[in-house]
Amino acid sequence: MTHTVAVSGASGYAGGEALRLLAGHPFVTVGAITAHSNAGERLGALQPHLHALVDRVLAETTADVLADHDVVILALPHGASGALAAEIAERSPDTLVIDAGADHRLESAADWEAFYGTAHAGTWPYGLPELPGQRERLAGTRRIAVPGCYPTTSILALAPGFAAGLLEPRDVVIVAASGTSGAGKALKPHLLGAEVMGGMSPYGVGGGHRHTPEIEQGLAQAAGEPVRISFTPTLAPMSRGILATATARLRPGVAAADVRAAWASAYGREPFVHLLPEGQWPTTKAVLGSNHVQLQLAVDERAGRVIVCAALDNLTKGTAGGAVQSMNIALGLPEQAGLEQQGVAP
């Protein structure tokens, strides 16, 4: 059976990445392709790498255009998905709506209002299949909230330790470097090549980044209790990719062998998350353009901490690939369908 998939926000990075993956998906057909300010333009003028779709014309982003597809992927800025998703659901209740933006990720309305400053649109099933029990929640659902790129990286880095009861929940530090595509395609002076190339800079320092409560929410799900983190994102001079270094204090009596065994057990059968052989460390280049995640860990016995490094492509596993992976589960398709791409080297 072939499913028709519409993509909104197709002129942006996340929407373009979704189309790249869907164009090679064996069980879907790309339906409506929509945008806001770029409606009426030829897709090839904005996404020239999408050779199979270059002659498609971008439609207006409306519920009328998007409804009645089997699947709709909303690759829109935060605050733009909530009302549109509700309208699509009213017109076409059987459509699987996948929000690649932030609007439906957080369970806490108070956290949403504190970090985003608008009314909470509600909570949808969270599209991170590797979290304990999450595949069961995604199977058959008609609504999916795609995790943010930093939360995907950070949660995958530390969730096994929390799920196994090895980590203290209130002493967690995460520093993550991301490529500039994570900030979107809109022109911003601090993202100009002359500003970015040759240097790195932190931002959202001091607990102010909007992904902070989402990371805490995912880790709390794994831990079964609240988790508090200190999160510092950093802008790196590359177009795509995230490398996160996450550290947490070990509970008393936890041995280094227990730590590695917990991560190996959690991810040993996962198709996309890979604990590397000891001594080999993740690189963003190794996962470029793929839905794969590389992890490595070490125990700092002197400090009593575990250090986990995780690398993924923020546009693939961190956004569009995560959307397609969760879509596959919701539709009962093979989980790896359309996601067979390997990393690119050199």
Swiss-Prot record:
| Pathway listed | Amino-acid biosynthesis; L-arginine biosynthesis; N(2)-acetyl-L-ornithine from L-glutamate: step 3/4
Question: What Pfam families has UniProt attached to this entry?
Answer: Semialdhyde_dh, Semialdhyde_dhC_1
Active-site residues annotated for this sequence = 149
- Compartments, record wording: Cytoplasm
Q: Which GO terms describe its cellular component?
A: cytoplasm
Q: Report the record's Gene Ontology biological process terms.
A: L-arginine biosynthetic process
Reaction catalyzed = N-acetyl-L-glutamate 5-semialdehyde + phosphate + NADP(+) = N-acetyl-L-glutamyl 5-phosphate + NADPH + H(+)
Entries under InterPro entries matching the protein: AGPR_AS (IPR023013), AGPR_type-1 (IPR000706), NAD(P)-bd_dom_sf (IPR036291), NAGSA_dehydrogenase (IPR050085), Semialdehyde_DH_NAD-bd (IPR000534)
Q: What is its EC number?
A: 1.2.1.38
Instruction: Fetch the SUPFAM superfamilies from UniProt.
Output: Glyceraldehyde-3-phosphate dehydrogenase-like, C-terminal domain, NAD(P)-binding Rossmann-fold domains
Enumerate the CDD domains for this protein: AGPR_1_actinobacAGPR_like, AGPR_1_C
Q: Which UniProt keywords apply?
A: Amino-acid biosynthesis, Arginine biosynthesis, Cytoplasm, NADP, Oxidoreductase
Q: What is its main location?
A: cytoplasm
Similarity field: Belongs to the NAGSA dehydrogenase family. Type 1 subfamily.
Q: What is this protein called?
A: N-acetyl-gamma-glutamyl-phosphate reductase
Name the lineage: Bacteria, Bacillati, Actinomycetota, Actinomycetes, Micrococcales
Name of the encoding gene? argC
